[in-house]
């Protein structure tokens, strides 16, 4: 069974293992979106402390990690393009899965659960960004109904900005 749960501090090491696995996977794909400095252990610790860190679990085991922020993203205030969505939105950052769990369709399952979480909170819009070389994430986003809206600057580099409006 796949679940999306608020991460707790006792899961920090497993969540970071998923992020570190994602970082290595990016390098295997020939690009660097995440450096050794970001996201780091303190980034995840802060996410979890603030109630924004989520663990993707398979049969209770941490298989992935992501940040879901319902407070918006200041970097999204300026876009070369235009957001299609207005009003409150959730931001998805730092989605990664442990290598052991790859190939199970977890990204699609996770987005389905993110949408359910947003619906339960009355939030109908989701925004995400990714690097230009991250073709896999672009494919996952587009397959899950996200639409390219333009380019934003996040942490000093250009990212492709996507959004999705929920029914």
Task: Kindly give the residue locations of the regions a language model identified.
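Glycine-rich phosphate/pyrophosphate-binding loop shared by adenosine-nucleotide-utilizing enzymes
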Residues: 2, 61-65, 90
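A short beta-loop-alpha structural element at the N-terminal edge
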Residues: 3-17
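Conserved GNAT-fold acetyl-CoA-binding loop/helix
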Residues: 23-43
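Conserved beta-hairpin
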Residues: 52-69
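Conserved acyl-donor/pantetheine-binding loop and adjacent beta-alpha core of acyl/acetyltransferases
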Residues: 67-94, 99-102
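Conserved acetyl-CoA-binding loop-helix of GNAT-fold acetyltransferases
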Residues: 97, 103-116, 139-143
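Conserved GNAT acetyl-CoA-binding A-motif
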Residues: 111, 118-130
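Conserved catalytic-core motifs of GNAT/GCN5-like acyltransferases
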Residues: 129, 142-161
């Amino acid at each position: 069974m796949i679940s999306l749960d608020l991460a707790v501090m006792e899961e920090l090491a497993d969540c970071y293992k998923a992020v570190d696995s994602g970082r290595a996977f990016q390098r295997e794909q020939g690009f660097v979106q995440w450096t050794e400095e970001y996201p780091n252990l303190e980034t995840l610790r802060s996410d979890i402390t603030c109630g924004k860190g989520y663990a993707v679990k398979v049969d209770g085991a941490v298989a992935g990690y992501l940040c879901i922020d319902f407070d918006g993203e200041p970097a999204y205030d300026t876009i070369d393009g235009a957001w299609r969505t207005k009003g409150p939105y959730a931001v998805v950052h730092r989605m990664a899965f442990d290598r052991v769990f790859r190939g199970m369709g977890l990204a699609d399952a996770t987005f389905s659960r993110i949408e359910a979480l947003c619906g339960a909170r009355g939030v109908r819009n989701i925004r995400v960004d990714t690097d230009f070389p991250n073709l896999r994430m672009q494919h996952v986003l587009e397959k899950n109904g996200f639409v390219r809206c333009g380019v934003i600057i996040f942490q000093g580099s250009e990212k492709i900005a996507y959004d999705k409006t929920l029914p």
